[in-house]
């Protein structure tokens, strides 16, 4: 998918009935892609998919081997989007309190003080989430769902926007365990970056020689811009026929002998949000069935059954 590039002038805006706010989101998205592609070479499609997820208000799961640029992607996004960023390596000894935070007694004031966990930031990279304990995984996924943490009876809200990019090693790698479906359902998409092609890897090597670090990524969008963009996406028009089409597709995944677990109602809502974001980045203020099909290909759906694998 490519972002629609015909909506760059006011004349074309009027001809295609996009509002100024919608055009601003289009131009903002293109600016973010231009910055991130400085360090993530040859992966524009992945950048767009992650951007769609952010506009749809979802969290992202990236499954891939180490070294393909997952951390670099998260850092570059945080810089381009002007977001605070934290990373936590989910080793087996990571505790839930490392994620959510804890209270500690201040010996000088004799009062308990809250020490923030790693998850309390705008963009949180949960690295190798399938290498840690189920209890620690649950702590993070609860934060993702609720948008807040409660420690010793006191609730602390996540900053807004709040985005989690979690990575996991391929199933079967040493020291890993599969995330339960109930936890996978918290992610709006499940992506794989893959190896770069020949031309992209050569360009990457040349850029490393010329010392083009992530620090060269410029902030082009503010946190407030992201929140406003989400409101614009929410207002994209969806007809009754498309609503019915979304539910029909969801039901098709639930009654498919080749899929272990179909799209949940929460997944259907996520599909609607992704569909709206897709329509806007394609240059429309309304959704068509093709947007639904494209978005459904990104939304996380359960693993195939054994029969499907055969």
Where in the sequence are the language-model features?
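Walker A/P-loop
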Residues: 55-91
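Walker B catalytic acidic pair
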Residues: 127-128, 139
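Conserved AAA+ ATPase small/helical "lid" subdomain
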Residues: 216-268
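Single conserved hydrophobic/aromatic residue that forms the stacking wall/gate
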Residues: 299-310
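Pre-Walker A (pre-P-loop) alpha-helix and adjacent loop at the N terminus of AAA/AAA+ ATPase modules
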Residues: 26-60, 65
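Conserved alpha-helical scaffold flanking the Walker A/P-loop in AAA+ ATPase domains
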Residues: 49, 106-125
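Conserved C-terminal helix/linker of AAA+ ATPases
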Residues: 221, 243-244, 284-298
């Amino acid at each position: 998918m490519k972002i629609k590039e015909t909506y760059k002038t006011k004349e074309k805006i009027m001809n295609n009935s996009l509002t100024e706010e919608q055009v601003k989101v289009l131009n903002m998205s293109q600016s973010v892609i231009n910055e991130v592609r400085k360090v993530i070479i040859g992966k524009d499609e992945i950048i767009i998919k992650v951007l769609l997820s952010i506009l749809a208000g979802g969290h992202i799961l990236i499954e891939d081997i180490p070294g393909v640029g997952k951390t670099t992607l998260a850092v570059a996004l945080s810089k381009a989007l002007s977001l605070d960023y934290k990373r936590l390596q989910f080793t087996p000894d990571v505790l839930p309190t490392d994620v959510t935070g804890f209270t500690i007694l201040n010996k000088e004031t004799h009062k308990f003080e809250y020490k923030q966990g790693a998850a309390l930031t705008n963009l949180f990279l949960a690295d190798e989430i399938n290498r840690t304990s189920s209890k620690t995984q649950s702590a993070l996924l609860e934060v993702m769902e609720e948008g807040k943490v409660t420690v010793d009876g006191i609730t602390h809200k996540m900053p807004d926007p709040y985005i989690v990019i979690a990575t996991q090693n391929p199933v079967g790698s040493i020291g890993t365990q599969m995330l339960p479906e109930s936890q996978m359902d918290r992610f709006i998409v499940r992506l794989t970056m893959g190896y770069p092609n020949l031309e992209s890897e050569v360009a990457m090597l040349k850029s490393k020689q010329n010392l083009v670090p992530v620090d060269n990524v410029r902030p082009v969008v503010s946190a407030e811009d992201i929140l406003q963009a989400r409101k614009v996406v929410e207002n994209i028009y969806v007809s009754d026929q498309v609503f019915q089409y979304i539910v029909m597709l969801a039901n098709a995944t639930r009654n498919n002998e080749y899929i272990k677990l179909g799209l949940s109602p929460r997944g259907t809502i996520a599909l609607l949000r992704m569909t709206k974001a897709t329509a806007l980045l394609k240059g429309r203020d309304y959704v068509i069935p093709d947007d639904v099909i494209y978005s459904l290909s990104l939304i996380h759906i359960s693993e195939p059954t054994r029969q499907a694998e055969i």
